[in-house]
Amino acid sequence: RLVGSEMCIRDSLWLDLKGPILADTVYIGGTLVAKDVTISLPAVTPVTADFKAMGTYTAPILGQIEAMEASITKIGIDLGLRNMIKLESKTIEIRWAQDVKQADGSTKTEGCKAFLRCVSKGIPGLSVDPGNTSENEATFAVSRYQLYVGGAEYWLIDQLNTILRVGGVDYAKDIRSLL
Protein backbone atom coordinates (compact mmCIF):
# COMPACT_ATOMS: atom_id res chain seq x y z
CA ARG A 1 0.00 0.00 0.00
CA LEU A 2 1.40 3.39 -1.04
CA VAL A 3 1.10 6.38 1.29
CA GLY A 4 1.98 10.07 1.28
CA SER A 5 4.58 11.13 -1.27
CA GLU A 6 4.78 7.60 -2.76
CA MET A 7 1.10 7.84 -3.68
CA CYS A 8 1.55 11.32 -5.19
CA ILE A 9 4.42 10.06 -7.34
CA ARG A 10 2.37 7.11 -8.58
CA ASP A 11 -0.68 9.28 -9.32
CA SER A 12 1.43 11.84 -11.20
CA LEU A 13 2.56 9.08 -13.56
CA TRP A 14 -1.00 8.43 -14.76
CA LEU A 15 -2.48 10.31 -17.67
CA ASP A 16 -6.12 9.95 -18.58
CA LEU A 17 -6.36 7.79 -21.68
CA LYS A 18 -8.22 9.64 -24.40
CA GLY A 19 -10.33 7.21 -26.36
CA PRO A 20 -12.40 7.38 -29.51
CA ILE A 21 -14.41 10.35 -30.70
CA LEU A 22 -18.04 9.46 -30.03
CA ALA A 23 -19.81 12.09 -32.15
CA ASP A 24 -19.33 15.59 -33.56
CA THR A 25 -21.40 18.54 -34.75
CA VAL A 26 -20.61 21.69 -36.74
CA TYR A 27 -22.39 25.04 -36.29
CA ILE A 28 -22.25 28.31 -38.22
CA GLY A 29 -24.00 31.29 -36.64
CA GLY A 30 -25.60 28.99 -34.08
CA THR A 31 -27.20 26.82 -36.80
CA LEU A 32 -26.35 23.13 -37.10
CA VAL A 33 -24.81 22.54 -40.56
CA ALA A 34 -23.21 19.11 -40.20
CA LYS A 35 -23.19 16.09 -37.91
CA ASP A 36 -20.87 13.08 -37.60
CA VAL A 37 -18.44 14.40 -40.20
CA THR A 38 -14.69 14.08 -40.68
CA ILE A 39 -12.90 17.24 -39.56
CA SER A 40 -9.25 18.21 -39.92
CA LEU A 41 -8.37 21.08 -37.62
CA PRO A 42 -5.47 23.38 -38.55
CA ALA A 43 -1.84 22.61 -37.91
CA VAL A 44 -0.13 25.59 -36.29
CA THR A 45 3.38 25.83 -37.69
CA PRO A 46 5.68 28.73 -36.82
CA VAL A 47 7.78 30.18 -39.63
CA THR A 48 11.43 29.23 -39.16
CA ALA A 49 14.62 31.22 -39.62
CA ASP A 50 18.22 30.12 -40.07
CA PHE A 51 20.89 31.35 -37.66
CA LYS A 52 24.66 30.97 -38.02
CA ALA A 53 25.84 28.87 -35.08
CA MET A 54 28.53 26.24 -35.74
CA GLY A 55 26.90 25.92 -39.12
CA THR A 56 23.17 26.47 -39.43
CA TYR A 57 20.63 26.41 -36.62
CA THR A 58 16.99 26.57 -37.71
CA ALA A 59 14.54 27.81 -35.08
CA PRO A 60 10.87 28.82 -35.01
CA ILE A 61 9.92 32.50 -34.98
CA LEU A 62 7.07 32.67 -32.48
CA GLY A 63 5.66 35.87 -33.97
CA GLN A 64 5.02 34.36 -37.40
CA ILE A 65 2.69 31.47 -38.31
CA GLU A 66 2.35 29.59 -41.59
CA ALA A 67 -1.10 29.70 -43.23
CA MET A 68 -3.66 27.64 -41.32
CA GLU A 69 -6.16 25.44 -43.13
CA ALA A 70 -9.05 23.26 -41.97
CA SER A 71 -11.32 20.86 -43.80
CA ILE A 72 -14.69 19.26 -43.23
CA THR A 73 -15.75 16.21 -45.23
CA LYS A 74 -19.53 16.00 -45.37
CA ILE A 75 -21.90 13.41 -46.77
CA GLY A 76 -24.63 14.83 -49.00
CA ILE A 77 -25.35 18.00 -50.93
CA ASP A 78 -27.64 20.06 -48.71
CA LEU A 79 -28.19 23.48 -47.10
CA GLY A 80 -25.52 22.69 -44.51
CA LEU A 81 -22.93 22.29 -47.26
CA ARG A 82 -24.15 25.49 -48.94
CA ASN A 83 -23.79 27.44 -45.67
CA MET A 84 -20.26 26.12 -45.13
CA ILE A 85 -19.20 27.08 -48.66
CA LYS A 86 -20.46 30.69 -48.66
CA LEU A 87 -17.53 32.83 -49.75
CA GLU A 88 -17.55 35.14 -46.74
CA SER A 89 -15.86 35.28 -43.35
CA LYS A 90 -17.58 33.08 -40.79
CA THR A 91 -17.03 31.53 -37.38
CA ILE A 92 -17.40 27.77 -37.37
CA GLU A 93 -18.00 26.06 -34.03
CA ILE A 94 -17.09 22.39 -33.89
CA ARG A 95 -18.19 20.28 -30.91
CA TRP A 96 -17.27 16.70 -30.19
CA ALA A 97 -17.41 14.17 -27.38
CA GLN A 98 -14.59 11.79 -26.60
CA ASP A 99 -14.27 8.78 -24.31
CA VAL A 100 -11.75 9.11 -21.45
CA LYS A 101 -10.42 6.28 -19.26
CA GLN A 102 -9.43 7.59 -15.81
CA ALA A 103 -6.80 6.38 -13.31
CA ASP A 104 -9.40 4.54 -11.20
CA GLY A 105 -10.55 2.57 -14.25
CA SER A 106 -13.78 4.49 -14.72
CA THR A 107 -14.80 6.01 -18.01
CA LYS A 108 -16.18 9.48 -18.59
CA THR A 109 -17.29 11.44 -21.61
CA GLU A 110 -15.41 14.69 -22.21
CA GLY A 111 -16.65 17.59 -24.31
CA CYS A 112 -14.37 19.46 -26.70
CA LYS A 113 -14.94 22.58 -28.80
CA ALA A 114 -13.01 24.33 -31.53
CA PHE A 115 -13.81 27.77 -32.91
CA LEU A 116 -12.48 28.74 -36.33
CA ARG A 117 -12.73 32.17 -37.97
CA CYS A 118 -12.33 31.34 -41.60
CA VAL A 119 -13.40 31.74 -45.19
CA SER A 120 -14.11 28.96 -47.66
CA LYS A 121 -11.24 28.37 -50.08
CA GLY A 122 -13.65 27.56 -52.87
CA ILE A 123 -16.53 25.42 -53.97
CA PRO A 124 -15.57 21.74 -53.88
CA GLY A 125 -16.05 19.41 -56.79
CA LEU A 126 -19.12 17.34 -55.99
CA SER A 127 -19.27 13.58 -56.38
CA VAL A 128 -22.49 12.40 -57.99
CA ASP A 129 -22.59 8.63 -58.50
CA PRO A 130 -25.90 6.71 -58.62
CA GLY A 131 -26.16 4.21 -55.78
CA ASN A 132 -23.46 5.94 -53.71
CA THR A 133 -23.45 8.79 -51.24
CA SER A 134 -21.97 12.13 -52.23
CA GLU A 135 -18.88 12.82 -50.11
CA ASN A 136 -17.65 16.41 -50.36
CA GLU A 137 -14.66 18.12 -48.73
CA ALA A 138 -14.88 21.82 -47.89
CA THR A 139 -11.55 23.54 -47.16
CA PHE A 140 -11.13 26.78 -45.23
CA ALA A 141 -8.44 29.43 -44.83
CA VAL A 142 -8.31 29.95 -41.05
CA SER A 143 -7.21 33.19 -39.36
CA ARG A 144 -8.30 32.34 -35.79
CA TYR A 145 -8.27 28.95 -34.06
CA GLN A 146 -9.33 28.35 -30.47
CA LEU A 147 -9.53 24.93 -28.80
CA TYR A 148 -11.22 23.90 -25.53
CA VAL A 149 -11.00 20.42 -24.00
CA GLY A 150 -13.09 19.63 -20.92
CA GLY A 151 -13.91 23.33 -20.53
CA ALA A 152 -10.24 24.45 -20.41
CA GLU A 153 -8.69 26.55 -23.17
CA TYR A 154 -5.75 24.72 -24.72
CA TRP A 155 -4.79 27.39 -27.25
CA LEU A 156 -5.86 30.48 -29.12
CA ILE A 157 -4.08 31.48 -32.31
CA ASP A 158 -5.34 34.68 -33.93
CA GLN A 159 -3.18 35.81 -36.83
CA LEU A 160 -5.07 39.07 -37.44
CA ASN A 161 -4.79 40.21 -33.80
CA THR A 162 -1.29 38.83 -33.08
CA ILE A 163 -2.34 36.33 -30.40
CA LEU A 164 -0.43 33.09 -29.87
CA ARG A 165 -1.64 31.71 -26.53
CA VAL A 166 -0.88 28.10 -25.62
CA GLY A 167 -1.58 26.68 -22.17
CA GLY A 168 -2.32 30.16 -20.83
CA VAL A 169 0.98 31.68 -22.01
CA ASP A 170 0.71 34.38 -24.71
CA TYR A 171 3.89 34.11 -26.75
CA ALA A 172 3.01 37.19 -28.84
CA LYS A 173 2.35 39.52 -25.89
CA ASP A 174 5.75 41.20 -26.13
CA ILE A 175 5.31 41.79 -29.86
CA ARG A 176 1.90 43.43 -29.33
CA SER A 177 3.30 45.67 -26.58
CA LEU A 178 5.87 47.10 -29.01
CA LEU A 179 3.44 47.86 -31.84
Language model features with spans:
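Short, small-residue-biased leader/transition segments that mark boundaries at the very start
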Residues: R1-I9
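Short, acidic/charged, Gly/Pro-enriched secondary-structure junctions
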Residues: M84-A114
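Solvent-exposed edge beta-strands and adjacent loop segments
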Residues: R10-L79, R117-V128, V169-L178
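Solvent-exposed loop and beta-edge segments used for protein-protein assembly and interaction
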Residues: L62-E66, K86-K90, N132-S134
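Well-ordered beta-strand positions in beta-sheet-rich domains
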Residues: E69, G111-F115, E137
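Beta-strand elements of well-folded, non-transmembrane domains
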Residues: I72-D78, W96-Q102, L116-G122, V142-L147
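Mixed-charge, glycine-accented linear interaction segment located at domain edges/termini
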Residues: V119-L179
